[in-house]
Amino acid sequence: MANHKSAAKRAKQSEARRLRNKSTRSSMNTAVKKVRTAKEAGTDNATDLLNSAKSLIAKAAKKGVIHQNTAARKISRLTKSLG
């Protein structure tokens, strides 16, 4: 339990941010999985799914959920795997 008001507030803010980041990260990972399964299945919509996954990865980096370099690496490897 926090000893100060400010510590309690920070704990509350941290928890809210953690949940927000978890949601963003989860949707990003789901999009990446959809691209990989579409690639393995050989469906035509893999490039559309790739574009949406790229967008979600870039948004996660912009929000600070993941580092910019991590986002670039994920996008690069995902694009390379389809090519």
Swiss-Prot record:
GO CC terms in record: small ribosomal subunit
One Pfam family from the UniProt entry? Ribosomal_S20p
Q: Which UniProt keywords apply?
A: Ribonucleoprotein, Ribosomal protein, RNA-binding, rRNA-binding
Q: Which InterPro entries match?
A: Ribosomal_bS20, Ribosomal_bS20_sf
Hey, which family's this protein in?
A: Belongs to the bacterial ribosomal protein bS20 family.
For bias type Basic residues, the affected ranges are: 1-11
Query: For this protein, what is any one GO molecular function term?
Result: small ribosomal subunit rRNA binding
Q: Which GO terms describe its biological process?
A: translation
Q: Where is this region: Disordered?
A: 1-44
Lineage, top-rank taxon, reads Bacteria
- PANTHER family cross-referenced by the UniProt entry: 30S RIBOSOMAL PROTEIN S20, SMALL RIBOSOMAL SUBUNIT PROTEIN BS20C
Q: What does this protein do?
A: Binds directly to 16S ribosomal RNA.
For this entry, the protein name equals Small ribosomal subunit protein bS20
Cystine links in this protein are none
